[in-house]
Curated annotation (Swiss-Prot):
This is Ganoderic acid synthetase CYP5150L8. The chain crosses the membrane at residues 2-22. Induction: Expression is induced in ganoderic acid (GA) producing conditions. SUPFAM superfamilies: Cytochrome P450. It is found in: Membrane.
């Protein structure tokens, strides 16, 4: 006989789908008057949304239909897509508690890595953010900057050994992925994944690196989980997924989840033991006890009461959340910078000159201090402009917890010809916020908004941009989101990028090869060397420069 739990899931799923279809086609929605692109009756706009080159479709939608657009998902379920600054402020800042990040009781990320900061809501999120804010402070970044330099020097040595005296085609994206994982490991967890002397064989590191590539093979998994998550408990959902024999990627995702949980638990226990032995024991660990998890654990152990502490489940979840949130986003941002520098050799040479001069001032063999590094104008301009035009995440999602009204900065023309100044959202409506679209809005940034021009950051920004009050946490940009749910580690990520560029550019030149590079849209944008390939890869011609 079939497993009773599967029968219950099938019945619940069928009933839920019937209700959705009934509700969609018999009840008129306030979103019906918004402009919208063509969609299919069953899948809606999902084929375009999950397509690997969907960034082209998003640009078309943004330019054609404006800053408030109706999209559809399965069975005509309606969604709002917006990149209007006032709407984003309302959703991310003013009424953030009424727009939870989760679309259900849990989603596939919490199912596989636990209730970390990215996925916590309400009081749980506020408590976690309160504990984590101090460990991402500027003072903490100064403490770990030498760790970043140490990893960067190892990378420089490894690349020199590979290229020798001649230029070589190297998978730069692969090296950036290994390096950012090691930086996150040492400065974040006090753990080393990679010695750069050979291919990595660390099971924890391999699990972390595999998480997003595997989840990319099951793009509809999150929709399946979200559809049923409000109706069945987490333990039952995991049991159902274990029975997904025809879907090997789902089973692999479960194994990856188990490896991450097991290794995180072991690392946490080792750190707790070292903390109990005192500072001398911490000094001998990777990160010397100044890594983020050691600082967090120490603060947590010294909390005034047990009720104020983070429980072990949440501490474990922070580890995988921290790595997964920072690894591909930072490594692919670095890859994008190096790709753009290879396309613009004049910019590369100008930046190399600034970085070489900064290193000469502090003296050979010494690190450029944190406070000097973050003030280098052209380095900052290159990083800002790349993150403006190519944010690692193109979109973020929210859900209306109740009937809401979203104001717009400027009206859009409705399908009935009237001007729409605000959008009424029925409860449970899913909202997609266009981060890249806001960053490249010509009304705010000018006609050259789609051009990569680092020099724009060396002069006053457009007055329209200042007046729009974009709610981003970083430089009038939405690249790291905004409000209390903005990226807590954006300065950490910037420091990683700037340290690596400071070491790599004076040491190597980067040129394009004969093969084109394709950038693909996924949970995080990633490069491939073939338009049909799913393997993250970016070949550049790398040549060692005279020391």
């Amino acid at each position: 006989m079939p497993d009773s739990s599967l029968v219950l899931v099938a019945i619940a799923g069928a009933a839920y789908i019937f209700w959705l279809v009934f509700h969609r086609y018999l009840v008129r929605s306030p979103l019906d008057n918004l402009p919208s692109p063509p969609s299919s009756p069953f899948l809606g706009n999902l084929p375009d949304i999950i397509h690997r080159q969907s960034h082209l479709w998003w640009r078309h939608v943004s330019n054609t239909y404006g800053p408030a657009t109706k999209l559809t998902a399965f069975f005509g379920i309606q969604m709002l897509y917006t990149f209007d600054p006032k709407a984003m402020y309302s959703i991310l800042v003013k009424d953030t508690e009424l727009y939870p990040k989760k679309t259900a009781a849990y989603d596939d990320f919490t199912l596989f890595i636990g209730p970390g900061l990215l996925f916590a809501e309400g009081a749980q999120h506020r408590r976690q953010r309160k504990w984590l804010n101090p460990v991402f402070s500027v003072a903490q970044l100064r403490d770990v900057s030498h760790v970043f330099y140490g990893v960067a020097y190892k990378l420089e040595e490894a690349i020199r050994n590979r290229v020798g005296a001649q230029s070589q085609n190297l998978d730069v994206n692969g090296w950036m992925a290994r390096t950012t994982l090691e930086m996150l490991g040492q400065a974040g967890l006090g753990y080393s994944f990679d010695k750069f002397t050979e291919d990595s064989t660390d099971s924890y590191g391999e699990a972390l690196k595999s998480f997003f590539p595997v989840i990319n093979h099951v793009p509809l998994l999150n929709l399946f989980v979200m559809t049923l998550a409000n109706h069945i408990p987490k333990w039952l959902m995991r049991r159902v997924l274990r029975l997904a024999v025809p879907f090997p990627h789902v089973l692999r995702l479960l194994r990856i989840s188990e490896t991450m949980q097991k290794r995180s638990s072991e690392i946490i226990q080792q750190k707790k033991t070292a903390l109990q032995k005192g500072d001398k024991a911490l000094i001998h660990q990777v990160g010397e006890g100044k890594d983020i998890m050691s600082v967090l654990l120490k603060s947590n152990m010294n909390a005034p009461s047990d009720s104020e502490k983070l429980p072990d489940e949440e501490l474990l979840a922070q580890m995988s959340t921290f790595i997964l949130a920072g690894m591909d986003t930072t490594s692919n941002a670095l890859s994008r910078i190096l790709h753009l520098l290879a396309e613009h050799p004049d910019v590369q040479e100008k930046l190399r000159h600034e970085l070489s001069e900064a290193r000469e001032i502090v003296g050979n063999g010494k690190d450029v201090p944190y406070d000097d590094l973050v003030k280098l104008p052209y380095l900052d301009a290159v990083c800002r402009e790349t993150l403006r035009l190519h944010p690692p995440l193109n979109l973020i999602g929210r859900r209306a917890a109740k009937d809401m009204v979203v104001p717009l900065s400027s009206p859009v023309r409705g399908r009935d010809g009237t001007l729409v100044n605000e959008v009424t959202l029925p409860k449970d409506t899913f909202v997609l916020l266009g981060l890249q679209a806001c960053n490249t809005n010509k009304k705010l940034w000018g006609e050259d908004a789609y051009e990569w021009k680092p020099e724009r950051w060396l002069q006053p920004l457009p007055s329209m941009l200042e007046e729009a009050r974009v709610p981003g946490v970083y430089s009038n940009l939405m690249s790291f989101s905004g409000g209390v749910r903005s990226c807590i580690g954006f300065k950490f990520s910037q420091l990683e990028m700037k340290v690596l560029l400071t070491i790599l550019l004076p040491a190597f030149s980067f040129e394009l090869t004969e093969k084109p590079i394709f950038w693909n849209t996924s949970a995080v944008s990633y490069p491939t060397m073939d338009k049909d390939s799913t393997r993250p890869e970016m070949l550049l011609k790398v040549k060692a420069l005279a020391c």
